[in-house]
Amino acid sequence: MLTAALILCSSDGAESAKKAPAQWVPLKGCRFMTEEASDGDSFHVKFGQREFIFRLYFVDAPETDEKLTDRIEEQCEYFGVTMKEHRKAAAAAKQFTTEWLKTPFLVTTRWQNALGRSRLPRYYALIETSGHDLAEALVQRGLARAKGTVAILPDGTKAKDHMAKLKQIEAEARAKRVGIWADSKFGGK
């Protein structure tokens, strides 16, 4: 917590995103902020007096911003769904994340720049509530896929091993036809 406080209190705390990723920093006592631009894998968080946007490592949820047509088309192709089915899944992923973050949660970040078009910088993070990983929960419910920026986890788990675990969870969600997979033309392959 002291490390987090030092980073946040320094004049260049947000600037650290321009540098190589640093040590993992746990941010306890974060609060979810309702924002129109939030979706299943990217959202606004209040920590102390500061507001941040965090983007989940390892996963990609259906986009809610309909201006991102190329990404939405690629996601529709991957999941085997129509635009209408994609919109439904994007809303479900956003709702799930909103509900998940109503309970106390832990943000763990290295302040790695996740890019974005917002007024605030966006950083990659891992999010946990009661020891459960949000990214894993999204994939398990068919509300995201295993894809995206990866990192060695704070416990030392290799990124490729964690991604393999998420890919397996995704395959199980697809086979069970949950979430977006319920509407997929690919069936339970």
Question: For each predicted feature, which ranges?
Answer:
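Small beta-barrel nucleic-acid-binding modules, primarily SNase/OB-fold domains
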Residues: L8-K189
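Bacterial N-terminal signal peptides
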Residues: M1-I7
